[in-house]
């Protein structure tokens, strides 16, 4: 009998994995699975991805232990006491149209995950802590198969912040499969998922010895022959199924990349000013993806299709005020304005000419340089 993470049931049973999943449901998660700690193939491939430089300037991905080994390639280098990884997921999709369904060139696109009223790191972590706080209550005294030898319980929570590759453990916890766009895709919820993990010293019985298994099994890959995400990427960042070159990815370029964006990639950014959803927007599994009921993930209306003019001329005070508690702050004001003037250059809208002429003399040299490029784009089209 196989076992995959499913939408969490309302009923309770006596098994420890089911009770853990019940805690996750009570905390507001829609999916929960439990993976063993193994040297999974995807983790073994991680050093090669780093060696190829496909992580770009994200130096934190290169974090190494005292022996010089990449931490993200093995949990043993991060938390050697970990025996099981609890992976929780919550849907953040909203009722607004996808980026591929809205084409207004005078407005920019902020990635759907960043619209929320509360930073997802905090919202998901709060739920994880609620689960973590009750785990010890589930353990029977002196149950050596579940607790470490000294009887204590060790845990650690991560929400996109720790030195591990969450999607790999999400796959092996049965939460979903890793799509060709590298996102976790769930058959019922699609890929609009925030992931949170709890590392724990709880050791469940081996999968092969229990029916149903104590650990969840990987969800089967249901991408099939579909390559829509690969074909739709404007910058060809998906270099092979399941393999992303961050240096070409619009999300990386608009969020993580500091300084100048290579000229040959600017046109591909289109109207994106923070992140990109295209590879998820075109995914067939997201056609009927349900919307979230979580209040924290309802959108701030000002962040849905914001006017490029507003973004390009934003002041530091307005940036701090508008994006307080928002992931958009990661791009910093300079990066957001840079992205906005690139989008103006891609808009083919001559109404931006006066603004770009002013911004070409901006005190921020990055904004000024990209405004000059954008100005040239519009002027060349008007001739």
Where are these predicted regions, by residue range?
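Positions within the helices of HEAT/ARM-like alpha-solenoid repeats
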Residues: 336, 366-368
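Iron-sulfur cluster-binding cysteine motifs and their immediate structural context
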Residues: 29, 228-251, 272-296, 355
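Core register positions within helices of long alpha-helical scaffolds
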Residues: 343-346, 373-377
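Auxiliary alpha/beta "docking" domains used to position bulky ligands
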Residues: 2-220, 261
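Non-heme iron-sulfur electron-transfer modules
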Residues: 48, 86, 193-199, 238-266, ...
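Amphipathic alpha-helical scaffolding segments comprising HEAT/armadillo-like alpha-solenoid repeats
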Residues: 320-322, 349-360, 380-383
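Alpha-solenoid HEAT/Armadillo-like helical repeat scaffolds in large eukaryotic proteins
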Residues: 310-314, 322-327, 355-363
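Short inter-helical turns and helix N-cap capping residues of alpha-solenoid HEAT/ARM repeat scaffolds
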Residues: 333, 363-364
